[in-house]
Regions:
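N-terminal targeting signals for export/organelle localization
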Residues: 1-47
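Thiol/disulfide oxidoreductase modules built on the thioredoxin-like
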Residues: 114-119, 126-173
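Conserved segment of the thioredoxin-like fold in thiol-based oxidoreductases
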Residues: 91-92, 96-128, 140
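Short pre-active-site segment immediately N-terminal to redox-active cysteine/selenocysteine motifs
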Residues: 40, 65-67, 71-75, 139
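Hydrophobic beta-strand anchors of alpha/beta hydrolase catalytic cores
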Residues: 68-69, 97, 143
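A short beta-strand-turn-helix
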Residues: 45-67
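Short, Lys/Arg-enriched, disordered terminal segments
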Residues: 1-6, 26-32, 58-59, 91-92, ...
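Conserved redox-active cysteine motifs that mediate thiol-disulfide chemistry
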Residues: 71-88
Length: 174
C-alpha cells in the first residue's frame, strides 16, 4: 500500500513537470513587442556608416512626423528576414528611417546593405552597443517609432518586423 502511494506521488510529479514544460512551449512571445514606451529620447552622437561623419541624434529627428529607428547587424539572421519590410517602409515619403548598426564590422554592414538594399536615410555605427542600451533595446532586431515633435519613443517592436507589425506601423504613421 505504501509502495503504491509512492508510485502515485512520483507519477503526479512527473505529470506536473511535463504539464509545466509543455505549457511553457505554447508561449508565443515572452516580451511585449508592441509596448508603448513614451520614453524621451536622449541625445547622443555616433559616426555615420558611409561618411564617417559624427551625427547627433537631435539632427536625425527631421521635419517628418515620425522617425523609425531599426537596430540591426549583418550577422543577425532575423534582421535579414525583416529587411524586405524595412525596404517597403523606406519608400514612404512621410517617414525618416534610421538604421543603427549594432556591434558589427562596418565592411560586413556595407556588404549587407549592398546585397539587400538600403531602406535607411542614415546608418549610425553602434560598435559597443551603447546607443541600443540608451534606447532601451533588449537585443536585435528591434524597431522604435519616434514622434519627432515630442522627441519620444511611442512604439517599440522587439524582434523582426512581420506582416502584423508592418500593418501596425503603416496605420500608426498615416
Amino acid at each position: 500500500m505504501k509502495r503504491n502511494l509512492i508510485y502515485l506521488i512520483i507519477l503526479i510529479i512527473i505529470f506536473f513537470v511535463f504539464y509545466v514544460f509543455f505549457k511553457g512551449l505554447n508561449k508565443v512571445n515572452i516580451y511585449t513587442p508592441n509596448e508603448i514606451t513614451n520614453k524621451k529620447i536622449v541625445n547622443f552622437s555616433s559616426k555615420e556608416l558611409y561618411t564617417q561623419k559624427n551625427v547627433s541624434f537631435s539632427d536625425i529627428l527631421l521635419d517628418n512626423k515620425f522617425t523609425i529607428v531599426n537596430i540591426w547587424s549583418s550577422w543577425c539572421l532575423p534582421c535579414r528576414d525583416e529587411h524586405k519590410y524595412l525596404i517597403k517602409l523606406g519608400q514612404k515619403n512621410n517617414l525618416n528611417m534610421v538604421g543603427i548598426n549594432y556591434k558589427d564590422d562596418p565592411t560586413n554592414a556595407k556588404k549587407f546593405i549592398d546585397q539587400f538594399g538600403n531602406p535607411f536615410s542614415l546608418i549610425l555605427i553602434d560598435k559597443d552597443g551603447t546607443i541600443a542600451i540608451e534606447l532601451g533595446a533588449y537585443g536585435i532586431p528591434e524597431t522604435f517609432i519616434i514622434n519627432n515633435l515630442e522627441k519620444k519613443i511611442i512604439k517599440k517592436y522587439i524582434g523582426p518586423i512581420n506582416d502584423e507589425n508592418f500593418n501596425d506601423i503603416i496605420n500608426l504613421i498615416k
